[in-house]
């Protein structure tokens, strides 16, 4: 499948907040770790600090959990 930096991908991990959402690959680690793709999204998740509007907008995924959009 060969996902690389800058690709638009759709998340296929069912338990993820961003399931079926499209994000942009920020980096791909080739050292052999399981969740080697860092994906950045436009919207933030629900994990913001109390009293702020923010949350995380990146997450790590395995290549098998992503498909090119």
UniProtKB/Swiss-Prot annotation:
Protein's GO biological process: photosynthesis
Keywords recorded for this protein, A-Z: Membrane, Photosynthesis, Photosystem I, Thylakoid
Pfam families per UniProt: PSI_PsaE (PF02427)
GO cellular component entries: photosystem I reaction center; plasma membrane-derived thylakoid membrane
InterPro entries: Elect_transpt_acc-like_dom_sf, PSI_PsaE
Gene3D superfamilies in alphabetical order: 2.30.30.50
Topology in the lipid bilayer: Peripheral membrane protein
Subcellular locations according to the entry: Cellular thylakoid membrane
Similarity annotation: Belongs to the PsaE family.
NCBIfam families xrefs: PRK02749.1 (NF002745)
Functional description taken from the UniProt entry: Stabilizes the interaction between PsaC and the PSI core, assists the docking of the ferredoxin to PSI and interacts with ferredoxin-NADP oxidoreductase.
Name by which UniProt lists this protein: Photosystem I reaction center subunit IV
């Amino acid at each position: 499948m060969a996902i690389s930096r800058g690709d638009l991908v759709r998340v296929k991990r069912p338990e993820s907040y961003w399931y079926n959402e499209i994000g942009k690959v920020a980096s791909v680690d080739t050292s052999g770790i399981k969740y080697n793709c860092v994906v950045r999204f436009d919207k933030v998740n629900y994990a913001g600090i109390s009293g702020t509007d923010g949350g995380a907008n990146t997450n790590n995924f395995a290549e098998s959990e992503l498909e090119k959009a």
